[in-house]
Amino acid sequence: MTPEEIAALPYRPCVGVVLMNGDGFVFVGQRMDQNTDAWQMPQGGVDEDEDPFEAALRELWEETGVTADLVEMVAETDGWLPYDLPHDLVPRIWKGRYRGQEQKWYLFRFLGRDDQIDLETGHPEFSRWKWQDPDRLVAEIVPFKRDVYERVVAAFAPHLG
């Protein structure tokens, strides 16, 4: 695909979840489908006619096993935060239909225990997880998502740590 063709593609609507524990650390999972040391927070597409908040709760459950009764919403981003995929990935991800994603992010306080996080879900996305200091989070994220993660951490900074 040419850069012009990629620029004409839409963004995929997506939600992201910052899951914060009582110590102010955030959940990150190591992706199963990457050969690199790629970490990220739970995120995923918004289904057609799905409310973004409900999509965030669904993605959190699908990726971590954490149910809605174990979280409390603290904040959400004002708008949608876009990022572009590297051009070489566009034809391979989402069958070349999107140039990247635009994400609505939610900050949830985790009310449960660590043993209630279960990566062995129907479609596992993470091989392992950890609680990470928000100040050190961005450095572990794949480079093309770092700008969005910086904006998310900045947006939620008053509530983190």
From Swiss-Prot:
Domain Nudix hydrolase: 10-154
Keywords on record: Hydrolase
Motif Nudix box: positions: 44-65
GO molecular function, one term: guanosine-3',5'-bis(diphosphate) 3'-diphosphatase activity
EC numbers: 3.6.1.-
Enzyme kind, highest EC tier: hydrolase
Annotated GO biological process: nucleoside phosphate metabolic process; ribose phosphate metabolic process
Gene3D superfamilies: Nucleoside Triphosphate Pyrophosphohydrolase
Domain of life: Bacteria
Alphabetical list of InterPro entries matching this protein: Nudix_hydrolase (IPR020476), NUDIX_hydrolase-like_dom_sf (IPR015797), NUDIX_hydrolase_CS (IPR020084), NUDIX_hydrolase_dom (IPR000086), RppH (IPR022927)
A family per Pfam: NUDIX
Family per record: Belongs to the Nudix hydrolase family. RppH subfamily.
NCBIfam families (alphabetical): PRK00714.1-4, PRK00714.1-5
Function: Accelerates the degradation of transcripts by removing pyrophosphate from the 5'-end of triphosphorylated RNA, leading to a more labile monophosphorylated state that can stimulate subsequent ribonuclease cleavage.
Protein's UniProt name: RNA pyrophosphohydrolase
Organism: Ruegeria pomeroyi (strain ATCC 700808 / DSM 15171 / DSS-3) (Silicibacter pomeroyi)
Gene from which the chain derives: rppH
